[in-house]
């Protein structure tokens, strides 16, 4: 149809038209000018710019005016335009020119109403599809030439199928729109006939990347379409292209409600009707349209309605004809409600285009005739207005203009004599849509968010808020903290959007987050606490049972927040191993660590749940036990139940129990394979011992400490094992030690047990992993350096039978009690300390390294080790303990050191260790301000000078 003769242009539009026409006259001075030219050029800067650059397009419009059905020629026209294209750059230029040319014709026809709004939407959609298909075909041939043709196992060539989503899929694309695509191929396989072979996934990924570049990358000619691939399975974090099988698995196992909404409009680009296309449609259909009337979707729709309402209020979207109340999105939403609920039973509701589907909704009596009429009329009104708005400058916007020129353009283009008249009619249409929307969806169902104190936090979680929206909820926070908090919420919400969460998980998360935010935002350090919680939450968003645990148990949620607020180390542990959340259910056990002597029995009972012959489950169970016990120790630490020395005691008892369990497991595996060494037939025990050095030996274990271990065996040289695969007895113990190391270091889903360092064994890394008791004794007497005797001060046996323990303790005592030249000993200990200090030098003089700097913990350790080696020959009882605190007590008790000095060193040691311990809980380094521990450092240096400098 035509509205010619056209009404007179307002003055402002006449002036705009004359400016545009003057440019065209320069480019095509002989071309006649009509009233239609003046009208279109007044409405669209995009059209006037395009025709000024390509005056032949203007001439073409005069010679062959745009027609409603000319989309049927797009494929042929584009094919002709690509005849001389020989490379990707030329392809990109040709596609951009073609899109711009066709858009100019569509805008011309649209402005003059020589085609209906439905025709314009069809033309815009067909244009995009033709370009996408042509680009795919051109690039497919090029890629096949480079890498061969992708084939399945039977050698059948595999195509790239492209799903157009959203308005493109529905044939309702707007004038300036991005395009939502999903790439998929039928079967896995490899390329054939190319210079190099690729698997199909690689081939189609590369093809997809090149296709996106051809369409999306800005050049001097602009771009063709902004390509959005986020609707694909797993979003941005997923593969760019999936096989049919992978896509089917995803939608069956993890498809979410919003993906059902999106898939309603999915359409294969190119109108393909081959076997592969039919297979893909059949695969997707059960996910989108359920065979039964699917009322389970209603709550999701209500939740979405509430989100829309909050977004309208928050963003003041009254001037947005798509997102505002009663806008285009609500009409689309209303239509899809019926498609998702009843589409499985009603084939007429399975269409992709909105208006035909809306008519079928009316025919089924699901909406009244008046409602269908109101929605259809409003939809066409809004879509025409949207296209005219975007055609002004080829910009993707749905917000009505505030400047007079563009307001007059829209008013005249819509057939109104003024902006106010247009706005009045627009308001009527949007109110009619909103009325149907409210009637259809109803009120949000009551849920957790209806609790008064949580409703605001529901809005905070569900919406993309401005920073200012957070202030009323958190008046006690500073602006800086609010900004950090807001940033964390937004980043978390974006990260969640990339995860594949089922409908139930999404619902639970949406109920949990307001509760969690209400608790967290009440804290002064809300930003810090939330930043510690979000990694954990991201780790469990796809594991609904954990979300439900926190939602249903407010006590567990409270304990989680408390622990994460107190310690980022605990937060990190929970994030890595969510199984630990079960420990939060009972506060009475959470804050009461296992009794020191009960760890071995607790672990034994824990392992009884696991088949003894299942090595993998045994490994996993020991790790889970360690983590749960460490969490309880940390909770007791944070809760003030355990002082720092007791924390180390508990961590040490735990490690000893685990060492025994690991040796037991390794022993069982070795005996099953080789039998046991024959010399054990008439004696108790296993002839194997584990010696702990360092922090474990000294009862000073921390949360992340590694274990310094040395393995000893007690086995005659002529012993063999008694199994069918008999091996040398000492070879058996070597393999046993190797198996122990393997069990400690194997990484399972629950991580490793401990880092184990066995380099303190005789001859270090060059020595045998396990030594005989006799070889250990000989090495310590004849080859060991003074620093190795220092290390022996902190050594003790943590696994083995009493006979081996007595032998080891006898060797240790004998070595430590040996007569030594005082000056030589002092020099060697002092020089070793200097080497360490140089190796671990702290170059930042404004900081004090609590452990390694002068006056720190290492100096105290060297003092105690020196004193044992210096005076144990006179007083053997100085060798009784392996930890620094009790060694200092022995020094005072037996008169080696004044009691006041021993107490001062002990206090300095405990104070600095306590600080190191709490820094570890905060995941901070051991370097503090140089102004810290001044008195303690002075005392340590006085003692250092006294004992090791001879001052």
Swiss-Prot record:
Protein name: Bifunctional glutamine synthetase adenylyltransferase/adenylyl-removing enzyme
SUPFAM superfamilies assigned to the protein according to its UniProt record, in alphabetical order: Nucleotidyltransferase (SSF81301), Nucleotidyltransferase substrate binding subunit/domain (SSF81593)
Signal peptide: none
Entry similarity comment: Belongs to the GlnE family.
Keyword presence, ATP-binding: yes
Annotated gene: glnE
Pfam families given in the database record: GlnD_UR_UTase (PF08335), GlnE (PF03710)
Cofactor: Mg(2+)
Function: Involved in the regulation of glutamine synthetase GlnA, a key enzyme in the process to assimilate ammonia. When cellular nitrogen levels are high, the C-terminal adenylyl transferase (AT) inactivates GlnA by covalent transfer of an adenylyl group from ATP to specific tyrosine residue of GlnA, thus reducing its activity. Conversely, when nitrogen levels are low, the N-terminal adenylyl removase (AR) activates GlnA by removing the adenylyl group by phosphorolysis, increasing its activity.
Region (Adenylyl removase): 1-445
GO terms under cellular component: cytosol
A GO biological-process term: regulation of glutamine family amino acid metabolic process
Superkingdom of the source species: Bacteria
Residue span of region Adenylyl transferase: 454-951
Keywords: ATP-binding, Magnesium, Multifunctional enzyme, Nucleotide-binding, Nucleotidyltransferase, Transferase
E.C. numbers: 2.7.7.89, 2.7.7.42
Catalyzed chemical reaction(s): [glutamine synthetase]-O(4)-(5'-adenylyl)-L-tyrosine + phosphate = [glutamine synthetase]-L-tyrosine + ADP; [glutamine synthetase]-L-tyrosine + ATP = [glutamine synthetase]-O(4)-(5'-adenylyl)-L-tyrosine + diphosphate
HAMAP family: GlnE (MF_00802)
A GO molecular-function descriptor: [glutamine synthetase]-adenylyl-L-tyrosine phosphorylase activity
């Amino acid at each position: 149809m035509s509205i010619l003769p056209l009404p007179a242009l307002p003055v402002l539009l006449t002036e705009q038209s004359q400016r545009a026409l003057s440019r065209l006259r320069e480019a095509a001075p002989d071309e006649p000018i009509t009233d239609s030219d003046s009208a279109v050029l007044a409405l669209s800067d995009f059209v006037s710019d395009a025709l000024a650059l390509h005056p032949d397009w203007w001439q073409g419009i005069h010679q062959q005016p745009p027609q409603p059905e000319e989309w049927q020629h797009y494929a042929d026209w584009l094919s002709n335009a690509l005849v001389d294209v020989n490379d990707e750059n030329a392809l990109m230029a040709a596609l951009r020119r073609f899109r711009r040319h066709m858009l100019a014709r569509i805008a011309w026809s649209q402005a003059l109403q020589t085609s209906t709004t439905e025709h314009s939407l069809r033309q815009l959609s067909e244009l995009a599809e033709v370009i996408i298909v042509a680009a795919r075909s051109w690039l497919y041939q090029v890629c096949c030439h480079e890498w061969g043709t992708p084939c399945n196992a039977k050698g059948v060539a595999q195509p790239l199928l492209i799903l157009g989503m959203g308005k493109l899929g529905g044939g309702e694309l707007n004038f300036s729109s991005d395009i939502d695509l999903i790439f998929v191929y039928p079967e896995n396989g490899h390329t054939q006939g190319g210079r190099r072979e690729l698997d199909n996934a690689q081939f189609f990924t590369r093809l997809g990347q090149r296709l996106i570049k051809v369409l999306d990358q800005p050049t001097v000619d602009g771009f063709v379409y902004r390509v959005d691939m986020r609707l694909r399975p797993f979003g941005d974090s997923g593969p760019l292209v999936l096989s049919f099988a992978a896509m089917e698995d995803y939608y069956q196992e993890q498809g979410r409600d919003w993906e059902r909404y999106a898939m309603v409009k999915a359409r294969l680009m190119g109108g393909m009707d081959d076997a592969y296309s039919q297979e893909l449609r059949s695969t997707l259909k059960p996910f989108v349209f359920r065979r039964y009337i699917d009322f389970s979707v209603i709550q999701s729709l209500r939740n979405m309605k509430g989100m829309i309402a909050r977004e309208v209020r928050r963003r003041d979207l009254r001037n947005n004809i798509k997102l505002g109340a009663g806008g285009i999105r609500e009409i689309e939403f209303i239509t899809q409600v019926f498609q998702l609920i009843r589409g499985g039973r009603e084939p007429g509701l399975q269409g992709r285009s909105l208006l035909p589907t809306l008519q079928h909704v009316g025919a089924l009596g699901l909406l009244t005739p008046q409602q269908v009429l109101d929605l259809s009329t409003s939809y066409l009104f809004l879509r025409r207005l949207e296209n005219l708005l975007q055609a002004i400058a080829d910009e993707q916007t749905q917000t009505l203009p505030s400047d007079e020129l563009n307001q007059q353009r829209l008013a005249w283009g819509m057939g109104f004599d003024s902006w106010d008249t247009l706005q009045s009619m627009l308001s009527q249409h949007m109110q009619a849509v909103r009325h149907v929307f409210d009637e259809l969806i109803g009120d949000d169902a009551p849920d957790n968010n209806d609790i008064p104190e949580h409703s605001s936090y529901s809005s905070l979680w569900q919406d993309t808020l401005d920073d200012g929206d957070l202030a009323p909820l958190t008046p006690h926070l500073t602006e800086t903290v609010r900004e950090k908090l807001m940033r964390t919420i937004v980043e978390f919400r974006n990260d969640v959007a990339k995860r594949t969460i089922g409908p139930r998980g999404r619902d639970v998360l949406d109920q949990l987050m307001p509760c969690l935010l209400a608790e967290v935002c009440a804290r002064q350090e809300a930003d810090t606490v939330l930043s510690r919680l979000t990694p954990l939450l991201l780790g469990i968003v796809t594991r609904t049972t954990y979300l439900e645990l926190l939602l249903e148990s407010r006590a567990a949620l409270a304990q989680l927040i408390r622990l994460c607020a107190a310690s980022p180390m605990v937060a990190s542990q929970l994030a890595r191993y969510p199984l630990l959340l079960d420990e939060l259910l009972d506060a009475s056990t959470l804050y009461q660590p296992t009794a020191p002597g009960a760890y071995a029995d607790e672990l034994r009972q824990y392992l009884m749940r696991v088949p003894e012959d299942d090595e993998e489950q045994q490994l996993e169970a020991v790790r889970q036990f360690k983590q749960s016990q460490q969490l309880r120790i940390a909770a007791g630490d944070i809760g003030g139940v355990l002082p720092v020395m007791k924390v180390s005691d508990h961590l040490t008892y735990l490690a000893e129990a685990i060492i025994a369990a690991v040796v037991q497991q390794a022993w069982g595996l070795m005996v099953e394979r080789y039998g046991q060494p024959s010399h054990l037939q008439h004696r108790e025990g296993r002839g194997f011992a584990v010696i702990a050095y360092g922090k474990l030996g000294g009862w000073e274990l921390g949360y992340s400490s590694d274990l310094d271990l040395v393995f000893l065996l007690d086995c005659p040289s002529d012993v063999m094992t008694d199994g069918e695969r008999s091996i040398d007895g000492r070879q058996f113990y070597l393999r046993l030690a190797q198996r122990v190391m393997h069990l400690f270091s194997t990484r399972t889903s629950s991580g490793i047990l401990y880092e184990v360092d066995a380099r303190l064994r005789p001859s270090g890394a060059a020595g045998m992993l396990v030594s005989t008791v006799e070889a250990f004794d000989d090495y310590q007497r004849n080859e060991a350096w003074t620093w190795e005797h220092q290390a022996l001060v902190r050594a003790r046996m943590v696994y083995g039978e009493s006979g081996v323990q007595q032998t080891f303790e006898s060797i240790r005592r004998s070595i430590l009690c040996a007569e030594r030249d005082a000056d030589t000993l002092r020099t060697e200990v002092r020089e070793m300390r200097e080497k360490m200090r140089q190796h671990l030098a702290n170059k930042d003089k404004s900081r004090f390294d609590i452990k390694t700097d002068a006056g720190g913990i290492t100096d105290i350790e060297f003092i105690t080790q020196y004193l044992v080696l210096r005076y144990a020959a006179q007083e053997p009882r100085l060798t009784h303990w392996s930890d620094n605190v009790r060694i200092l007590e022995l020094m005072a008790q037996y008169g080696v050191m004044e009691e006041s000095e021993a107490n001062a060193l002990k206090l300095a040691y405990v104070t600095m260790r306590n600080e190191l311990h709490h820094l570890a809980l905060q995941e901070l380094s051991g370097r503090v301000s140089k102004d810290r521990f001044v008195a303690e450092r002075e005392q340590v240096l006085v003692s250092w000078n006294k004992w090791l400098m001879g001052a």
